[in-house]
Amino acid sequence: MEKRFIYADNAATTAVSEEVLSAMLPYFRTAYGNASSIYKLGRDAQRDVELAREKVAKALGAEPREIYFTSCGSESDNWAIKGTAELMAKKGKKHIVTSVFEHHAVLHTCEYLEKHGYEVTYVPVNDKGLIDPEDVRKAVREDTALVTIMYANNEIGTIQPIEEIAAVCREKGVLFHTDAVQAVGHVDIDVHKQGIDMLSLSGHKIHAQKGIGAIYIRKGIVLPNLVHGGGQERGKRAGTENVPAIVGLGVAIEAAVRNTAEKAAIIIPRRNRIIDELLKIPYTRLNGDREKRLPGNINISFEGIEGESLLLMLDLNGICASSGSACTSGSLDPSHVLLSIGLKHAVAHGSLRLSIEEDVSDEDVEYIIETIPKVVQRLRSMSPVWERMMKGEKYD
């Protein structure tokens, strides 16, 4: 009997789609020209890079000249935050506002700036992981250079009130950046209508290859060059263009934003069924807001067990999942995201993240809700923490 395989970790990465792979292949063997070369092979490559730029721009409601290709979402975040910090420092503005539960690409960049003379204010989230725009308003100062708030959280899927936060920034005359790596393709985005000044995205979250990303920078914002060298990316990011990856990103984002409502209508009922069934397990809680969350995100904590053990057991049963973000899954520290919404360390350690797409069928859903309770029960039967809980003893 063939072993069942269910991939439920799309927030960590996604498979390259057949459509994207087919679009990329010619650029490895036949259309391999350097996009900076003036002969036809190079001109064709440059044309296709610009076509991909147009696709990314259209998907975001931006203009092509506002799109720059990068290697990943983390690079885009670094450029937006460090670039703005350098730009605004010349005007005496050395204060950044962000939240306590951003991706580490944002948090660690802010920590870097703190070590180099900048001040950072970390606004809180409520127990559902939502930011109050009024907290952002209170945090903004005369010397604030940038507000950077993620669009949707990578662990608990909470979707932030981006338009309201952007409106606060616009009112205060402060630039606003959002890490939308998890949001693109799952929610409708229009950077101009929403008042977003800068936005980061990553290809491998939307079925493009790893190692390609992009950043939207509103026209009129002139960030310092990210990489010095040749004139690629209008002189802002030197280095020979990764044409196959760029073309793939264009195809991927075009597909990702196609029929988002229809895709969500398929995924959300499956997500809700999993949540409803798993919450029947005693001493279990849903992390994040029930409604204001990404369509395929499920994050649940099971008291009395370790997330790592849960993942290993699920893997043996053919289910790929996560206990937090893949970037930190090797760490024994509890998720900073879960701690920020008020979970105790022991409860945060027992978290499970499932991130599903349309390819997780109704049959797969039934297997998931049949398997996980059995695994949780088995782990609890071996857990000294669970035993202490049942005796009413403190365990955290």
UniProtKB/Swiss-Prot annotation:
It catalyses: (sulfur carrier)-H + L-cysteine = (sulfur carrier)-SH + L-alanine. Optimum pH is 8.3-8.6. It holds the Pfam family Aminotran_5. Optimum temperature is 37 degrees Celsius. GO terms for biological process: [2Fe-2S] cluster assembly; amino acid metabolic process. Keywords: 2Fe-2S, Cytoplasm, Iron, Iron-sulfur, Metal-binding, Pyridoxal phosphate, Transferase. The modification N6-(pyridoxal phosphate)lysine is found at K205. Pyridoxal 5'-phosphate binds at G73, S74, N154, Q182, S202, G203, H204, T240. [2Fe-2S] cluster binds at C327. GO terms for cellular component: L-cysteine desulfurase complex. SUPFAM superfamilies: PLP-dependent transferases. InterPro entries: Aminotrans_V_dom, Aminotrans_V_PyrdxlP_BS, Cys_deSase_IscS, Cys_deSase_NifS_bac/arc, Cysteine_dSase, PyrdxlP-dep_Trfase, PyrdxlP-dep_Trfase_major, PyrdxlP-dep_Trfase_small. It is an enzyme of class 2 (transferase). The active site is at C327. Homodimer. Forms a heterotetramer with IscU, interacts with other sulfur acceptors. NCBIfam families: FeS_nifS (TIGR03402). Functions as a sulfur delivery protein for Fe-S cluster synthesis onto IscU, an Fe-S scaffold assembly protein, as well as other S acceptor proteins. Catalyzes the removal of elemental sulfur atoms from cysteine to produce alanine. Belongs to the class-V pyridoxal-phosphate-dependent aminotransferase family. NifS/IscS subfamily. This is Cysteine desulfurase IscS. It comes from Ruminococcus flavefaciens.
